[in-house]
Amino acid sequence: MPEITVHVPDFATMNDYEVREHPLARFRDGRWSALSSYLKQRFETELMHLNEAWAMTSLAWRCPACERQKIDIARKTDSGIILCQLERHHDHLGDWASKILRETAFQGIPDTLSAQRKRACGAVLPLAERFAETLVCMDCNAADAAMKKDLGGRVHRDFSFSPSEIGAFIVARPNEPHERSLDRGI
């Protein structure tokens, strides 16, 4: 029987250049990427804070809400750290619906119906969500929370703006936090 040998690279022992040039990492991001090298040079610092979502996305990734590419999302903080952050944005109404289902769907039913009820709840829950979980930049995720706060009681506390709705009320600039337009958020 033929044998197959799989070589798993030890990225931890490689220098940044070796990781950057490896076929498995060539189009991914990390402290070793060409983009990171460029950002460190541009912002004149070696300090970076990259999260896993940033590192696991393509160098060409673009935020679906503000349309900025990663090179325009990264920004330097007042403390001299380059923030490279992407966030998983989801509809919190789905969380609220899930809580209601957990509290009510299984009361007073025999154990024999529990599995069937659980399947039914799993099938219904996505109908309560206005949009699927989406990766967005840190500034769009923050703009969602800030706009909900600005609107106060005019929106349900578990309401979330979709990425396209966020894109409609923000003013995006390269390497800066977003500004918001309350009029466009209503």
For each predicted feature, which ranges?
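Short, charged surface segments at domain edges that flank catalytic/cofactor-binding sites
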Residues: 20-62
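A positional "C-terminalness" feature that preferentially activates on distal terminal regions of long
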Residues: 43-46, 57, 68, 142, ...
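Short cysteine-rich clusters marking metal-coordination/redox-active sites
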Residues: 60-67, 137-140
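Histidine-centered nuclease catalytic patch
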Residues: 70-131
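Short metal-coordination and nucleic-acid-contact micro-motifs, chiefly zinc-binding Cys/His arrays
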Residues: 52-62, 82-84, 129-133
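Long, compositionally biased low-complexity segments enriched in polar/charged residues
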Residues: 4-33, 66-67, 75-79, 99-103, ...
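Polybasic, low-complexity binding patches
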Residues: 113-178
